[in-house]
Amino acid sequence: MAKGIMLHEVGEQVDLYLLIKSSTKGIASNGKPFLTLMLQDQSGDIEAKLWDAKQQDEVTYGPQTIVKVVGDIHHYRGRNQLKLRNIRPAGENENVKIDDFLETAPIPKNEMMDAVTQYIFEMKNPNIQRITRHLVKKYGKEFIDYPAATKNHHEFVSGLAYHVVSMLNLAKSVADLYPSLDRDLLYAGVILHDLGKVKELSGPVSTTYTVEGNLLGHISIMVTEIAKAAEELQIDSEEVLILQHLILSHHGKPEWGSPKPPMVKEAEILHYIDNLDAKINMMDRALERVKPGEYTERVFALDNRSFYKPVFHK
């Protein structure tokens, strides 16, 4: 099996199949069009430029196209980039399929869904439990398949479920240490906080924002979904309002996308847990691509910092 694109070092030549994750047209300083291609396999993704792009190239090299590329790994502005020597679409007779290039969560789907189901089962507040179970059942298929984002963290197949399960385990540890926390509320907030992304995002392959995602966003979407669930289940209680508040405030600040700051204890903890798991995922994925004694590529969402892998971390 060919070495993953993110495992190649600067200066190495590559000759392998990759999947086009996204394709964006630009105009160079000489006035000629080019395409910025994000190419991916199971190890991650890398940017490449297709210079002097023709109009037909925009169709030929669109998202979800498998291509055979030959090129060299370069380092540019803190990140590796693939300098193309040759690129062509893969033929129908070439034994490659899209699934071969998709990064997936490290835990099987059924195990993640079992874990979420168990946390819901442990809830003692019937109103919180019923709303959470209702929404997970309603969007279960998408929940287990979708990424958690288009970029930055958990942006892979089943990334949303993996993010939630990791956060649930964190929430359990925090609640064990601080028993004054309402476990049911915290667990429900974790499970539901990003569930609106199943409407905000297009799906697990070549993920983009939907019209609803661009115009409303996952926070507004889920606040509405909670209200609908409560109405369908004939639940008229304060739990509905507090669950909606947890969703509205989980980004922490207006400049980070939350209309309201956390004003309930469990909302504050949800924000911390979400932030911690996202950042650890970003660091882990960057660090696993470098050797001990090396620095990672710059991680834009972490203040554009590089991270060092200590030599003793063999």
UniProtKB/Swiss-Prot annotation:
Domain of life: Bacteria
Pfam families reported in the protein's UniProt record: HD
SMART domains: HDc (SM00471)
Domain HD: 163-279
Function of the molecule: Shows a 3'-5' exoribonuclease activity.
Database matches in PANTHER family: 3'-5' EXORIBONUCLEASE YHAM
Record protein name field: 3'-5' exoribonuclease YhaM
